[in-house]
């Protein structure tokens, strides 16, 4: 019931001082109140939901899309007894965002993550969602955008090339001392945070040593968006490298006004044994 959801999420909420928009979203989600949840969206809103299970995605645009998204979701969330939100990070600094890890295996949502990007008016203009739900119907093939030019695309092209070449120095060109990378492993429930260039270097040095066998590397979804009025530039990436133990992964990159990566939220599924623990 909605009461179960409210109580399940309440404990997680206690630890945070979330912004007004997130507070409303949280409460509206808990009561499954679609009308209330829509207060946080606008006609510029876009919600992208990717299912790791079958590599398909659904895109919901504008107010009508957001309404359809949550109507469909709340119907699917029939049994909330397993609902948990182990990580909620509300980022007040630009770009304003929320990084969420949640799950509800009792309703088929084995693993889920959302990144919310807010505009200056406190509306959710982008929401990238990855779920692992084996029972969900197949949706559309995921989008890989064509390069359009612009600072975000330039940084992304460099990042992609540097990643493929495992060139740490080249990859650092896209980051600044203010950059933050959060990496959450849904298998081990561990979150590691990297802040600043030294930490970013450590992050990719470790990752590249982990990615010892690239034969299984794939990136089925790459969505690059330049900044627009009131909305930061971003990239939504879904990738995997099961040959190196990375069975599922997704990154949402949020860019600063200069086209550098300000925030990067990474969620992986990597068995602990593979991580050398």
Indicate where each model-derived feature is located.
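A beta-strand edge to alpha-helix "cap/lid" segment located at domain peripheries
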Residues: 2-9, 13, 67-151, 157, ...
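Tandem-repeat/low-complexity and Cys-motif detector
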Residues: 11, 28, 58-62, 90, ...
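Short, aromatic-enriched amphipathic alpha-helices that serve as compact interaction elements
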Residues: 13-33, 148-167, 174
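N-terminal leader/targeting signatures
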Residues: 22-25, 56, 66, 70, ...
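Short, well-ordered alpha-helical segments enriched in acidic and aromatic residues
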Residues: 33-50, 167-184
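Structured segments of extracytoplasmic/periplasmic soluble domains
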Residues: 40, 73-76, 162, 174, ...
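A short gly/proline-enriched turn/hairpin at secondary-structure junctions
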Residues: 45-60, 72, 180-195
């Amino acid at each position: 019931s909605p009461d179960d959801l409210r109580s399940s999420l309440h404990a997680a909420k206690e630890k945070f001082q979330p912004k007004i928009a997130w507070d409303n979203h949280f409460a509206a989600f808990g009561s499954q109140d679609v009308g209330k949840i829509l207060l946080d969206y606008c006609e510029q809103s876009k919600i992208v939901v990717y299912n790791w299970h079958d590599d398909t995605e659904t895109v919901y645009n504008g107010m009508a899309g957001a309404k359809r998204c949550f109507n469909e979701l709340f119907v699917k969330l029939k049994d909330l007894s397993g609902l948990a939100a182990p990580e909620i990070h509300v980022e007040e600094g630009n770009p304003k965002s929320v990084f969420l890890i949640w799950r509800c295996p009792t309703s088929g949502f084995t693993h889920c993550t959302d990144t919310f990007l807010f505009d200056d008016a406190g509306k959710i203009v982008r929401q990238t969602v990855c779920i692992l739900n084996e029972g969900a119907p197949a949706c559309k093939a995921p989008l890989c955008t064509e390069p359009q030019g612009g600072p975000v695309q330039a940084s992304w092209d460099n990042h992609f090339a540097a990643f493929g070449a495992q060139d740490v120095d080249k990859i650092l060109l896209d980051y600044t001392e203010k950059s933050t990378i959060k990496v959450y492993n849904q298998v081990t429930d561990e979150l590691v945070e990297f802040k600043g260039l030294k930490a970013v270097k450590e992050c990719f040095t470790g990752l590249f040593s982990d990615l010892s066998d690239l034969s299984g590397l794939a990136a089925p979804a790459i969505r690059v968006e330049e900044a627009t009025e009131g909305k930061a530039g971003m990239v939504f990436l879904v990738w995997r490298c099961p040959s190196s133990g990375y069975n599922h992964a997704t990154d949402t990159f949020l860019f600063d006004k200069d086209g550098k990566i300000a925030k990067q939220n990474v969620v992986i599924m990597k068995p602990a044994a593979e991580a050398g623990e």
